[in-house]
C-alpha cells in the first residue's frame, strides 16, 4: 500500500530543493552579469566576487555585477559601464556596483564606495529623467542627476562629495542624505561632508580638488578614444601573458581570439563616442573633438559619418577643432573609405551660407596642410558645390585660402 504522506513529503522536499537550486543559479547568473569593462589601469587591481574569489584585473577585462574593485596604494583603474558612465577609481579605494539595470522599462545604477576616492562621469542612467543613480558612502547616500563628481572617505570616516561640469559643460545636482537629513549640492565650488559625530557640513573646494576634477578629462578622453594599434598591442600582451580569453570557444587561444575581442572593444567604444556626440552641443564640441583627435583615422571616419547622419549641426565645429590639431583624417588619403565621408563633410560646410566665410577659411587651412591626393580629390566637390549654389567664385575663394599649400603647386589639373 502506498503511503501518501511519505510520498507527499518526498515531493515537497524535492520541490524545496529544486527551488533552492534555482535561487542559487539565479544569484550566480546575476553575479556573473557583465556590466562594464576596464579601459585603463595602473598597477595591480583586484576584483572580489560574491563568493569571495579574487582575480587580478587586466586591461579590457569584464566587470560583473557585485564585483568589488579594489586598488592598492600605488594603483588606479578606469571602468566604463554599459550605460556610458565612466568611473575613475583612485589608489587605496573600493567600489562595488550592486544593481545595474539599463532598459526601456527601468534605469538604475546603485553602488557602494567603502574607502578611498572615486570620480564618476555619469552616463545615460543618471542623465535620463526616469533614471536613478545612487552611491552609498559610510556616512551619506548620494542621488545623482547628470554630472561629474568625486567622492572621498577620509581616515576619520568622514565622507565628502563635490561636483563639477561634465565633459559637455553641464552641471547636474547631487541629493545628499545623511542621518535623516537631506541637502542638495548645486555649487561646483563647494564640498559637502558628513561625519557620524558632527553631521553634515560644507566647505569651499580647494584649488587642488578643482584641478583633480578638471584633470579627469584627460582620463575620460583616453578611455573613450579608439586606437586600433594600441588595442592590438594590449591584446597581444594579454595573449603573451596568458590572460586572453578564448573568444571563439575553439579551445585554442591565439590571434583569431584577438580579432574577435578587438572588434567587440571597438564596437563598445564606438557606441560611447556616439553617446558623446548625442550629448554635445554646437557650442561645446571640445571633448568630442579631443576624443576623435586621439582616435585612429578609420574610427574618426566612422564617427563623423554617424555625426553627419544624426547630429550634423556639430560637423563644422568638430572639423574646425580637428583642423587646429593638424589631424591626419583631414589631411591624408590613407583610408579610402574616408574620402566619401570627407566629401559629405565639405559639401555640408560649403553649403552652409550662414557661416560660409568661416567654413571656407577652415577648409582652406586644411587643404594647405594636405597631401596632393587629398587636395585634388576635394576640388571636384568644391567646384560642384559652387555650381549648385550658383556661387561661381566659391572654388576660387577656397583656392585663394590654400595659397600657402606646397601640394597645391604640385597638383595636376589636366589640360582644361
Residue ranges and their predicted role:
Residues 2-15, 30-33, 54-58, 104-108, ...:
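C-terminal interaction modules
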Residues 53, 59-61, 67-68, 73-87, ...:
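N-terminal beta-strand/beta-hairpin edge segment
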Amino acid at each position: 500500500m502506498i503511503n501518501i504522506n511519505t510520498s507527499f513529503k518526498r515531493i515537497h522536499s524535492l520541490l524545496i530543493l529544486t527551488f533552492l537550486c534555482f535561487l542559487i543559479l539565479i544569484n550566480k547568473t546575476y553575479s556573473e552579469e557583465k556590466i562594464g569593462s576596464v579601459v585603463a589601469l595602473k598597477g595591480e587591481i583586484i576584483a572580489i566576487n560574491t563568493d569571495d574569489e579574487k582575480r587580478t584585473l587586466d586591461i579590457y577585462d569584464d566587470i560583473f555585477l557585485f564585483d568589488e574593485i579594489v586598488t592598492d596604494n600605488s594603483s588606479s583603474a578606469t571602468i566604463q559601464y554599459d550605460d556610458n558612465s565612466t568611473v575613475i577609481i583612485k589608489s587605496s579605494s573600493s567600489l562595488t556596483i550592486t544593481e545595474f539595470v539599463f532598459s526601456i522599462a527601468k534605469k538604475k545604477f546603485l553602488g557602494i564606495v567603502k574607502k578611498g576616492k572615486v570620480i564618476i562621469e555619469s552616463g545615460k542612467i543618471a542623465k535620463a529623467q526616469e533614471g536613478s543613480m545612487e552611491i552609498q558612502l559610510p556616512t551619506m547616500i548620494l542621488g545623482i542627476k547628470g554630472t561629474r563628481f568625486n567622492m572621498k572617505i577620509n581616515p576619520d570616516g568622514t565622507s565628502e562629495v563635490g561636483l563639477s561640469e561634465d565633459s559637455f559643460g553641464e552641471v547636474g545636482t547631487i541629493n545628499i542624505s545623511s542621518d535623516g537629513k537631506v541637502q542638495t549640492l548645486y555649487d561646483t565650488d563647494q564640498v559637502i561632508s558628513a561625519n557620524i559625530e558632527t553631521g553634515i557640513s560644507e566647505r569651499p573646494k580647494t584649488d587642488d580638488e578643482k584641478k583633480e576634477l578638471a584633470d579627469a578629462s584627460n582620463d575620460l578622453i583616453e578611455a573613450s578614444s579608439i586606437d586600433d594599434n594600441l588595442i592590438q598591442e594590449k591584446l597581444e600582451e594579454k595573449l603573451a601573458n596568458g590572460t586572453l580569453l578564448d573568444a571563439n570557444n575553439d579551445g585554442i587561444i591565439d590571434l583569431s581570439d584577438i580579432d574577435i575581442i578587438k572588434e567587440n572593444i571597438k564596437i563598445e567604444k564606438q557606441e560611447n563616442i556616439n553617446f558623446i556626440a548625442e550629448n554635445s552641443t554646437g557650442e561645446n564640441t571640445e571633448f568630442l573633438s579631443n576624443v576623435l583627435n586621439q582616435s585612429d583615422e578609420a574610427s574618426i571616419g566612422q564617427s563623423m559619418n554617424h555625426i553627419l547622419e544624426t547630429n550634423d549641426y556639430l560637423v563644422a565645429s568638430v572639423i574646425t577643432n580637428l583642423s587646429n590639431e593638424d589631424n591626419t583624417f583631414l589631411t591624408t588619403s590613407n583610408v579610402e573609405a574616408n574620402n566619401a565621408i570627407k566629401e559629405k563633410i565639405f559639401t555640408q560646410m560649403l553649403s552652409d551660407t550662414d557661416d560660409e566665410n568661416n567654413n571656407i577659411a577652415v577648409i582652406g587651412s586644411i587643404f594647405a596642410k594636405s597631401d596632393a591626393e587629398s587636395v585634388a580629390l576635394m576640388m571636384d566637390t568644391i567646384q560642384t558645390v559652387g555650381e549648385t549654389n550658383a556661387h561661381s567664385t566659391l572654388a576660387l575663394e577656397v583656392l585663394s585660402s590654400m595659397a600657402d599649400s606646397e601640394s597645391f603647386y604640385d597638383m595636376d589639373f589636366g589640360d582644361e
